[in-house]
């Protein structure tokens, strides 16, 4: 594991740390590299302030992040079964954001996944659909948002073009003064580095 090999610290919640330490596939984790963080308690890494916030997902104490450096901020929100006012507040007034657009609901419903897995993904502790990603984006749009990345797309239940078009449609049709062309919206690549954005 890269952390063990290069001595890179891991900042994670207690629940995630416990789950990692129990996973035999990860091998022995040097506990000195694991730094426990807590939801809604900002911490610093050099000039960066990291604000972890609770997200609804069926994992071991997962969090989203709001990263701040000076007057600039970036948000990361993946593995969300749903969003609420608390999540919206943590994603307001960002310069850039990475949002989950995991699946197209219809593709998931008619796809090959077993019923229990479909229900898990569609549930409140599952993953955000393209439509809900667009609706969440509508709640956090503002004049100074420079970039939106759509991420964590399902290989089986989504396409890059479909995620992009659906999110853009939600923005254009949403109850807000913006249109999708007002912002740089792009799909984060699974296997390639995305475009570098300066905020």
PLM feature spans:
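Short, basic/aromatic-enriched C-terminal tail that caps enzymatic domains
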Residues: 183-199
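Core dinuclear metal-dependent hydrolase active-site scaffold
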Residues: 37-96, 196-199
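Cap/insert and terminal regions of metallo-dependent hydrolase folds
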Residues: 85-185
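Short active-site oxyanion
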Residues: 5-10, 73-74, 183-184
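Active-site HxH/HxHxD metal-binding segment of metal-dependent hydrolases
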Residues: 1-41
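Active-site metal-binding loops of divalent metal-dependent hydrolases
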Residues: 15-16, 55-58, 78-80, 101-103, ...
């Amino acid at each position: 594991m890269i952390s063990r090999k290069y001595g890179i610290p891991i900042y994670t919640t207690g629940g995630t740390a416990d789950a990692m330490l129990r996973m035999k596939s990860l091998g022995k984790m040097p506990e000195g590299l694991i730094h426990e963080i807590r939801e809604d308690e900002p911490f610093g890494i050099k000039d960066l302030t990291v604000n972890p916030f609770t997200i609804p997902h069926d994992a071991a104490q997962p969090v989203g992040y709001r990263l701040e450096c000076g007057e600039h901020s970036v948000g990361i929100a993946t593995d969300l079964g749903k969003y609420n006012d608390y999540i919206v507040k943590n994603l307001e007034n960002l310069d850039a954001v990475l949002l989950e657009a995991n699946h197209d609901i219809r593709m998931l419903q008619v796809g090959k996944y077993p019923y229990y897995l479909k229900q898990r993904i569609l549930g409140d502790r599952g993953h955000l659909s393209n439509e809900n990603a667009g609706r969440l984006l509508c709640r956090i749009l503002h004049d100074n948002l420079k970039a939106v990345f759509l991420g964590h797309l399902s290989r089986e239940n989504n396409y890059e073009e479909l995620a992009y078009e659906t999110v853009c449609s939600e923005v254009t049709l949403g109850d807000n003064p913006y249109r999708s062309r007002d912002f740089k919206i792009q799909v984060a690549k699974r296997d390639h580095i995305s475009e570098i954005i300066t905020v």
